[in-house]
Amino acid sequence: MASMMSNAAVVGRTTPAQASMVAPFTGLKSVSAFPVTKKSNDITSIASNGGRVQCMQVWPPLGKKKFETLSYLPPLSEESLMKEVQYLLNNGWVPCLEFEPTHGFVYREHGNTPGYYDGRYWTMWKLPMFGCTDPSQVVAELEEAKKAYPEAFTRIIGFDNVRQVQCISFIAYKPASYDA
């Protein structure tokens, strides 16, 4: 048992530099140094936004499904659509079209937790348009998709192939049968 014990003595020494690293406690500050404001317990002193509440409206949740980025705006004109696609191209994103023939919005079919089959993933129209530099090419593909699937929702996404993320997504076409 004596062979297991060490004869080396451990000495813990503090240096003067360690003691001066933390400022010593000097006590609490005087209360007289702080301004004192008396708070009223009267309920009428609480700020009211009653004037603003009167002009607020609640978005009706039934019959007014909304989709993605530009869904609260009226349908895009062809000129506005071209500008959005040009913005996408100016940022170096790859345009891609996707369509959904039955549900143009997120829904829960196979449970109440988010999953693969809940409307987030749409069918890709052809391949991503790598190397596309002209918005009219994207709009021409959109027209082709509308002819092939006139009752499908179609969206344009902008994909950043460097960061491997989708940067923009908006509905470019809603079927005529959908009334919002």
From Swiss-Prot:
Transmembrane segments: none annotated. Keywords: Calvin cycle, Carbon dioxide fixation, Chloroplast, Photorespiration, Photosynthesis, Plastid, Transit peptide. Induction: The least expressed of the 6 small subunit genes. GO terms for molecular function: ribulose-bisphosphate carboxylase activity. One of its GO terms (cellular component) is chloroplast. PANTHER family: RIBULOSE BISPHOSPHATE CARBOXYLASE SMALL CHAIN 1, CHLOROPLASTIC, RIBULOSE BISPHOSPHATE CARBOXYLASE SMALL SUBUNIT 1A, CHLOROPLASTIC-RELATED. This is Ribulose bisphosphate carboxylase small subunit, chloroplastic 2. It comes from Mesembryanthemum crystallinum.
